[in-house]
Amino acid sequence: MLPSSICSMGQIPRTSPHYYGMLPKQMSKGHPPMVTRAVGGVEKGEVGGNVRSLQVMHSKELQAKIRKQLQRVELSPSLYDTAWVAMVPERSSSQAPCYPQCIEWILQNQHDDGSWGINSSSLSVNKDILLSTLACVVALKKWNAGSYHIKRGLNFVGRNFSVAMDVQNIAPVGFNVTFSGLITLASGMGLQLPVWQTDIDEIFHLRKIELERDSGGTISARKAFMAYVAEGFGSLQDWDQVMAYQRKNGSLFNSPSTTAAAAIHTFNDRTLNYLDSLTNKFGGPVPAMYPQNIYSQLCTVDALERTGISQKFAREIRDILDTTYRSWLHNEEEVMLDIPTCAMAFRLLRTHGYDITSDEMAHFSEQSSFDDSIHGYLNDTKTLLELFKTSQIRFSCEDLVLENIGTWSAKLLKQQLLSNKLSTSAQSEVEYVLKFPLHSTLDRLEHRRNIEQFKVEGSKVLKSGYCGSHSNEEILALAVDYFHSSQSVYQQELKYFESWVKQCRLDELKFARVMPLIVHFSSAATIFAPELADARMVLSQTCMLITVYDDFFDCPEISREEKENYIALIEKWDNHAEIGFCSKNVEIVFYAVYNTYKQIGEKAALKQNRSIMDQLVEDLVSSAKAMMVEADWTATKYIPATMEEYMSNAEVSGAFASFVCPPLYFLGLKLSEEDVKSHEYTQLLKLTNVIGRLQNDSQTYRKEILAGKVNSVLLRALTDSGNTSPESIEAAKEIVNRDAESSMVEMRSLVFSEGGPIPRPCKDRFWEMCKIVFYFYSEDDAYRTPKETMSSARAVILDPLRLIPPPSCPETLSS
C-alpha cells in the first residue's frame, strides 16, 4: 500500500501537556519562547564578524536595507574599466581626456599601498588589483597627471609582480591578454616597470599559452572572446570585426572597458554616446558592466527565494518581475542576449505565473548557442547550471526547447565533473543539481543548504573584480534569524505533537509507524512560515493518522472483522456508539481519527464561515474502503485486469484528500464549496493522487511483489509483456516513472499558471505534497532509510546552522 504518511524512524522524548486537537491557542499567536537546541540559529564561532553584527540588528532594519537594494541597484565601481574610460580622448582633440572626471576619481581613490581596485584588509593582493593598478597608472600617464600617484602605483606593481605569474591565483577573464596589453601600452609611453625583463617575458609567454590553448567553445566563441578582451590587443586587433558585437545601446558586451577601447581605436559615435550616458549617470567611476540592473535584481530575488525570506519582499519582487516581464515582451538585449540573465528571467517569471512560452528560449535550444558564446569559451559552470535548472520548468512533455536545453546542459555538466577541473564547491553544486531535480527537493531543506553555502561574495570577477549584490550580508543575516526563529517554533510544535500522539494512544499500536519527528519534518519542510502553525499542525496530525490507518489495513495481523468494524464506525461518524468496537486497536484508531478530524472541522468552520465536516468524513470513508479493497486483493491474490481498474482504486487508497486538503482551510484564505468542486481543484487532487501512487509504486515494487501485493509496476509488466521477468519489470518501471514525471509536468503547469478559482498558496500545497512524495520515494522506500531521513528532520527542526565567514565589499554606485 501507499504509505500516505511521509514519515520514518525514530522519536524524541515526549514532554508538554496533552491536547487532542491542533495547537493550543497560545501557540497560534506569535513565536513561542526560544528553545536552547537552536538558540542563535548558528553554532558558536561559525559566523563571520559582519554577519554576526548584522544578526543583532533588528529584523526591520535588515529588511529596509534589502528593500532599498531591491528598489535601486547599487553597482560597485571598477577601477579597471574606469581607467579605460579615462583614456578616451576628446572628440575634437587627442590631447585632452573626454572624461576628466574619471581621471579625477582615479587620483582620489588610490590606496595607501599605491594600489587601485577592490582592496581591503581582508583581501590579499590578487591579479585583479594588479590589473586595475596598472590600468590606472597607464591612464594617468596618458594625460601626464599625478606623477606621484604613478610612481607609487608602479612600485606596487613591481613589489607584487610575482602574483601575475602565479597560475594558482584566481584571475580575471582574459587576464594574460589584458595585463600584457597594458604592459605594452606602458612601455610605449616610456614607463618602466620595476621588474626583471625575464618576468615580463614570462607574462607574454603566459599570454601566448592562453591564446593557443584548446579552450571550450568553437571558432565563433573564440572570436567573441577575443572581441571581449579587445583592449588587450590594441592596434593588433581587427576593430571592424570587433564592432560586429556592438549592441543597440552602443556598447560592446555592455563592457565599459571594451567599449572605451573601441572608441579610442574607431572614434565610433555610438560607443562615445554609450560612454557619455555612463559617465553622466555615475560621474567619475564606472561599473564593470552596464546595464546589469535586471540581472542584479533577479539575482537578489533568487537569493531571497533560495534562503526562504522572499515572502517578506513580495511587493518589491513583483515590481522587479513586472519590469523584467516588460523587457522580455520587448525582446530587450539586456535580457535576451545574455544567457544566464535570459535563463534566470524565464525561470523566475514562469514560476511566478507570468504568461511566457519557451519559444523565447529557442535560441538556446541547441548546444551550439552555448558553444559559440563567451560562456562556452570559458566553459562557464554557473551558466550551465542556470540553463539546467531553467529546463526543468516545463509545462508540457512536448516542450522540445526546454527538453533539449536540459539534455545538452546536463551532458556538459557531467563532462565537467569527469574533467576534475571544478573547484570543490562547484563540484558539489553540480553533483547536487544533477542528482536532485527541482521537484524532488523540500523547501526548508533547500533553504538550510543555501544559507549554509551562501556566498556573500565580497567580489566577483569578469575582466575585473566587482561586488555583486550589496544586500547579501543583510540577506544572510535575515535568513539566519528567520531560520532560527522558525526552528524555535517547530520545536515547540514538536513537543505538542508528541504529547498529542501519546494522548491519542497511537504509541500503543504495535503495528503502526508512529514517528512524530519525521512526520512534523515533512510539514515544517513545506509549510515553513512560522505564522502558519495551525496549517502545519493539521498536516502533521492528519498525515500521522492516515499513516496509522494505512498500516491498520496493511497489517496481516489485523483481522477482516476489525477492518470492517472501522469502516462501519467511520460511516456512522457521530452515531458510532451504535456500532461498538471489536478490538482495542479499532477503538484507538477510530477515536484518534474522530476526535482530531472533529476538531479540525470545527476550527475550519470558524475560519471559512461554513462547515467542511461532510467533506472530511466522505474522504475518510472513501479512502478506508479503497484500502479495504487493496487488502482483499492481497488476501485473495487478485490481480486487476487493467491499469484503469487498479488506478481507479489506488488513487483513492492513497488518502491524499484526507491530509493534503484539510490544511488548505488554515492558510488565511477562503475556499468556497464551489472552489472545492471546481475543475482546477479536482485536477490538482487527481494529479496528486496519481503522482503519489506511481512514484511510490516505482520505488517499493520489489518488497510489495514479495509480499504478494498488487503494484502498478507488476501490473504494467504483466499487461505489456505477459510475464514478470527482470527485463519486463525494469521496462515497466521505466514506464511508470515516465508516467509519474509526465503527471508532474502537468501539475507544474496547473500550479504555476495564473487564473482559475484556486489561490496560488493553496495550489502550492498540492505541489509541495508531490515534492514530498518524490523526496521520500526517490531511491527506494524512505521508511527503510532512517539515517538519512532522520538527519534531514534534525536539519530542519533541531540542528543549528553552520556558516562560513564572508569577505567584505567596497563602496557602491547607485544605478
Curated annotation (Swiss-Prot):
Induction details: Induced by UV irradiation.
Transit peptide: 1-38
Catalytic EC class: lyase
Names of the cofactor(s): Mg(2+)
Gene Ontology CC: chloroplast
Record text on cofactor binding: Binds 3 Mg(2+) ions per subunit.
Gene Ontology MF: a single term: magnesium ion binding
Subcellular location, record wording: Plastid, Chloroplast
Keywords assigned by UniProt, alphabetized: Chloroplast, Lyase, Magnesium, Metal-binding, Plant defense, Plastid, Transit peptide
Annotated Mg(2+) 3 binding sites: 696, 700, 704
UniProt binding sites for Mg(2+) 2: 550, 554
One of the GO biological process terms: diterpenoid biosynthetic process
E.C. number: 4.2.3.29, 4.2.3.99
Reactions performed catalytically: ent-copalyl diphosphate = ent-sandaracopimara-8(14),15-diene + diphosphate; 9alpha-copalyl diphosphate = (12E)-9alpha-labda-8(17),12,14-triene + diphosphate
Locus of motif DDXXD motif: 550-554
Amino-acid positions noted as binding Mg(2+) 1 in the UniProt annotation, renumbered to this chain: 550, 554
Annotated family: Belongs to the terpene synthase family.
Free-text comment on this protein's domains from its UniProt entry: The Asp-Asp-Xaa-Xaa-Asp/Glu (DDXXD/E) motif is important for the catalytic activity, presumably through binding to Mg(2+).
Note: ent-sandaracopimaradiene is a precursor of the phytoalexins oryzalexins A-F. Phytoalexins are diterpenoid secondary metabolites involved in the defense mechanism of the plant and produced in response to attack (by a pathogen, elicitor or UV irradiation).
Role this protein plays: Involved in the biosynthesis of oryzalexin A-F phytoalexins. Catalyzes the conversion of ent-copalyl diphosphate to the phytoalexin precursor ent-sandaracopimaradiene.
Protein name in the entry: Ent-sandaracopimara-8(14),15-diene synthase, chloroplastic
Organism: Oryza sativa subsp. japonica (Rice)
Gene: KSL10
